[in-house]
From Swiss-Prot:
Pfam families noted in UniProt: Ribosomal_S2
Gene source species: Streptococcus suis (strain 05ZYH33)
GO cellular component, one term: cytosolic small ribosomal subunit
Family: Belongs to the universal ribosomal protein uS2 family.
HAMAP family per record: Ribosomal_uS2_B (MF_00291_B)
GO molecular function: structural constituent of ribosome
Name of this chain's protein: Small ribosomal subunit protein uS2
């Protein structure tokens, strides 16, 4: 059984790509058709490739991989944070700081500073400092937390990176490739897929689409860590859905009201 059904993908709007004039020709094989100037992603391929991504992430988690979720656009920020936390992994959901992976030593120093400020508050140091200095420390902490809070406890450079919109996260993807870190990503029709190791053709601009795919990747991690029973509820939900015999042509017509 597919980890994500065609019905779920359709309802989340995963099939809507970008305007045809904004496409990347390298995504041609993942495009089903064009409707009203918009590319329609081939959901049959998305179903198959989402399965492959799920298995890849699950197997990595089973081998105790450190997995980093990356998505800094507003449509992805909440899902990336929530699902990474649910899976017991790490995330960056605001601006990617150049060198986050390739200059990990410097990033660790900034994380150490964040933890130092937290300790200062916990041990009572704040109480004996001037209010102006405490205000400056809080301002510094807020900035560090915003950009590095999601990786503050990450023990090492990640073994796998899951990315929402690698077109936007090009710097992150380049750093991962430089270090040989495999990248699993939601790839829309405007993106060059060449640097992505495990591609999930999908609309990366719709909040529901991002939530659906990101949640399934988190499910994969949970299953890899705890075994199949941990995602039994998800599978039961899918099993309860009536089997669909509709073709992608029929599904596209349904969503467009034809």
């Amino acid at each position: 059984m597919a980890v994500i059904s065609m019905k779920q993908l359709l309802e989340a709007g995963v099939h809507f790509g970008h305007q045809t004039r904004r496409w990347n020709p390298k995504m041609a094989k993942y495009i089903f058709t064009e409707r009203n100037g918009i590319h329609v992603i081939d959901l049959q391929q998305t179903v198959k490739l989402a399965d492959q991504a799920y298995e890849f992430i699950r197997d990595a988690a089973a081998n105790e991989a450190v997995i980093l979720f990356v998505g800094t656009k507003k449509q992805a920020a909440e899902a990336v944070k929530d699902e990474a936390i649910r899976a017991g992994q790490y995330f960056i959901n605001h601006r990617w700081l150049g060198g986050t992976l390739t200059n990990w030593g410097t990033i660790q120093k900034r994380i150490a500073r964040l933890k130092e400020i937290n300790r200062m508050e916990e041990d009572g140091t704040f109480e004996v400092l001037p209010k102006k200095e405490v205000a400056l420390l809080n301002k510094q902490r807020a900035r560090l937390e915003k950009f590095l809070g999601g990786i503050a406890d990450m023990p090492r450079i990640p073994d796998v990176m899951f990315v929402v919109d690698p077109h936007k996260e090009q710097i992150a993807v380049k750093e991962a490739k430089k270090l040989g870190i495999p990248v699993v990503a939601m790839v829309d029709t405007n993106t060059d897929p060449d640097d992505i190791d495990v591609i999930i053709p999908a609309n990366d601009d719709a909040i529901r689409a991002v939530k659906l795919i990101t949640a399934k990747m988190a499910d994969a991690i949970i299953e890899g860590n705890q075994g199949e029973d941990s995602v039994a509820a998800v599978e039961a939900e899918l099993a309860a859905e009536p089997a669909s015999t509709e073709s992608i042509e029929e599904l596209v017509e349904v969503v467009e009201g034809k």
